[in-house]
């Protein structure tokens, strides 16, 4: 049963991949937006992304985008400094 849950979460994390050219254009603008819907719709700046399932040290995107060592992520759920099911931009 746990394997099915893990497989479902991994599938959701990979559902909306972003191409390399989109990633560069987003980074050059300094800010980004996430696709609408239920999955990966919350923009966050996170320092660590573990296999697209869990992102650590996350915070909301500031007016200048992500600064320092944090990278832009689109997360399904973000709470208490962590993001769940995140795609790194």
Swiss-Prot record:
Keywords: Cell wall, Disulfide bond, Secreted, Signal. It is found in: Secreted; Secreted, Cell wall. InterPro entries: Cerato-ulmin_hydrophobin, Hydrophobin_sf. Residues 1-15 form the signal peptide. GO terms for cellular component: extracellular region. Disulfide bonds join 34-74, 45-66, 46-58, 75-86. Its main location: secreted. It comes from the Eukaryota. Induction: Expression is slightly induced in the presence of root and stem powder of Shanxin poplar, as well as during carbon or nitrogen starvation. Belongs to the cerato-ulmin hydrophobin family. Homodimer. Homodimers further self-assemble to form highly ordered films at water-air interfaces through intermolecular interactions. Aerial growth, conidiation, and dispersal of filamentous fungi in the environment rely upon a capability of their secreting small amphipathic proteins called hydrophobins (HPBs) with low sequence identity. Class I can self-assemble into an outermost layer of rodlet bundles on aerial cell surfaces, conferring cellular hydrophobicity that supports fungal growth, development and dispersal; whereas Class II form highly ordered films at water-air interfaces through intermolecular interactions but contribute nothing to the rodlet structure. This is Class II hydrophobin 2.
